[in-house]
Amino acid sequence: MKTTLLIPVLNEIDGLKAIMPQIKREWVDQILFVDGQSTDGTVDWIKQNGYEYVIQQKKGMRYAYLEAWPHIKGDVVLTFSPDGNSVSDRIPPCIEKMKEGYDMVIVSRYAPGAKSDDDDAITGFGNWMFTSLINLCHGGHYTDAMVIYRAYRKDLIYELGLDLDKHYEVEEKLFHTRVSWEPLLSMRAARKKLRIAEIPGDEPARLGGVRKLQIIRWGSVFMYELIREMFIKNYK
């Protein structure tokens, strides 16, 4: 099993300087950044430290992933936030758990033994609500269905149709935003009864940069997807 650590960035120079020295290159087979056209020196720092990177052309986290996907060498992808929210010491146990034959392993902020120091009342409630609804409506057993910090098979994206624009275009046009695919990945993986595990991992507060959440718009999209997915059977 080969693993690619995929790190999407947009003006995260402070987080990179603090977090990347904690990540040993030998933990994974590839470290790949995808940069959303940062203006704070992020790309220069990535170059100076000898990391692979892709410059994103279309806006939105989903397109960051899609544009990075052809450059991924691993058969397992571990998505990681460099803003301080993802604790680096969970990388090795997440990979070891994947080696047990799981399709996806989530580093959960809300599993027993973990906590989030980044949540406020609104985001904490939203994460709990959507995770609970995904479990109720789609047969999941998650404590954290929304988090970026997770490992999964690279080809899972194609199996679940997450690479296809048609599965996002209605809601993104309706609510004038672009979203990531983690919630939809959680829904479809649960509905397909894939092998899913969670390990606990704290979520520290963000380090520098600007929080990019669009709470109302993203929440509206996720609610739309949650209802729509109850009636979809073909992901191709």
Regions found by a protein language model. Give the residues of each.
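The conserved acidic donor/metal-binding loop of glycosyltransferases
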Residues: S81-S86
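Acceptor/aglycone-binding surface of glycosyltransferases and processive sugar-polymer synthases
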Residues: Q57-K59, Y63-P70, S88-E172, R206-M223
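Donor nucleotide-sugar binding loop of glycosyltransferases
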Residues: E12-G15, S38, M61, V87
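Hydrophobic helical membrane-anchoring modules
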Residues: D14, P93, S132, D163, ...
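Cell-envelope/extracellular polymer assembly enzymes that use nucleotide-activated donors
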Residues: K2-T4, L184
